[in-house]
Regions:
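Extracellular "leader-to-stem" segments immediately downstream of a signal peptide or signal-anchor
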Residues: 4-79, 84-87, 93-97, 101-200, ...
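Metal-dependent enolase-superfamily TIM-barrel catalytic cores that perform enediolate-based chemistry
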Residues: 196, 209-211, 220-223, 231-233
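Surface-exposed loop/turn segments connecting beta-strands in extracellular beta-rich domains
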Residues: 87-88, 153-154, 213-215, 224-227
């Protein structure tokens, strides 16, 4: 048997042992030599909003309005039905579960304007203001991204990627934080958005979703507490 065959066989075994198809319903306790919190699946209010797709253009507005409305009402689940949804940056809010139905695909825009205004984020350890993430949250509690749907990042042929070519987080490190704003205006470049990157959040839950084609890091919780990420592809 060739080395290539052995490597392929190991890869197939590994793929077959991970992902949502092999994910148990229960979250097992973490065994460690020190005290760990009990990780549990979050419980959201029973309220549900089913998002309606825009007939033309991108669907950022109806999805974001559903998230905002649900959070203001005390929380619940925002359901994205099957279909290809073109969208800009979405901001998750407290006590809301964004649920991607099987067959639902969020295809994120590659245009800078769809990620404005600039938001607080980090790039290579440097705090600054830029595009943030496709799925972003700041200072929220009890947020979730669940379901059997798919999150598809922008292509590398997009405007955002091209406007990042000369950017380095080192250029802003000597400026005060308030001056580290990179929103693409006045010919300025931008920092690439991560795919899922909450910051300063508590109780973050991600389960079952497939991530495909990201411009930068896919899943990057920053300054967050009590995070559960399981069964992803």
């Amino acid at each position: 048997m060739s080395l290539t065959s052995i490597i392929c066989g190991i890869a197939l075994l590994t793929i077959g042992e991970v992902g949502p198809q092999n994910m148990p319903d229960t979250i097992e306790p973490v065994e460690s030599p020190f005290v760990m919190p009990l990780f549990e699946r979050p419980v959201f209010p029973e309220s549900t909003i089913l998002v309606r797709m825009e007939q033309e253009g991108i669907s950022t507005k109806p999805i974001q309005e559903a998230i905002d409305s649900m959070s203001c009402r005390g929380g619940g689940t925002v359901v994205v039905p099957p279909g290809v949804w073109r969208t800009g940056r979405l901001i998750l809010k407290s006590h809301v579960n964004l649920h991607l139905s099987e067959g639902a695909e969020l295809h994120f825009s590659g245009n800078i304007i769809d990620y404005l205004p600039a938001v607080f984020t980090r790039d290579e350890g440097v705090e600054l203001y830029s595009l943030g993430a496709c799925l972003y949250a700041d200072g929220q509690e009890n947020i979730a991204l669940t379901g059997k749907g798919k999150v598809v990042g922008p292509p590398t042929s997009c405007e955002i990627y091209k406007r990042n070519e000369s950017m380095s987080s080192d250029k802003g490190i000597r400026k005060p934080l308030a001056d580290r704003i990179y929103d693409g205006k006045n010919g300025e470049g931008v920092f690439l958005p991560k795919t899922f990157a909450p910051i300063n959040c508590k109780n973050v839950f991600v389960e079952g979703v497939t991530f495909e084609r990201g411009l930068y890091w896919n899943i990057v919780p920053q300054y967050c507490e009590h995070i559960v990420i399981r069964g992803l592809q």
